[in-house]
């Protein structure tokens, strides 16, 4: 079974080797047919502390690393500075 992969934006990097990633999803309400946006935060392992808030990253499922971390950052794109 393949591992799940999600795409999101880093919202926090305050803990060592960990980033908090916000993943947005969209779906249509089954009765009202309105498009609804929902988001969820995931704690992901960032071994080299290379990602900062605003960076786009892809995270992948892994075995539990700590109490909250079950995802690992596999790749990312750094936010372009102005």
From Swiss-Prot:
Complex and partners: Part of the 30S ribosomal subunit.
The encoding gene: rpsQ
Protein family (similarity comment): Belongs to the universal ribosomal protein uS17 family.
Organism listed in the record: Bradyrhizobium diazoefficiens (strain JCM 10833 / BCRC 13528 / IAM 13628 / NBRC 14792 / USDA 110)
This protein's UniProt keywords: Ribonucleoprotein, Ribosomal protein, RNA-binding, rRNA-binding
Presence of the UniProt keyword rRNA-binding in the record: yes
Family matches, as PROSITE patterns: RIBOSOMAL_S17 (PS00056)
SUPFAM superfamilies per the UniProt record, alphabetical: Nucleic acid-binding proteins
Record has Ribosomal protein as a keyword: yes
UniProt-recorded Gene Ontology molecular function terms: rRNA binding; structural constituent of ribosome
Name of the featured protein: Small ribosomal subunit protein uS17
GO biological process, one term: translation
Pfam families with a match to the protein in the record: Ribosomal_S17
This protein's GO CC annotations: cytosolic small ribosomal subunit
CDD domains assigned to the protein according to its UniProt record, in alphabetical order: Ribosomal_uS17 (cd00364)
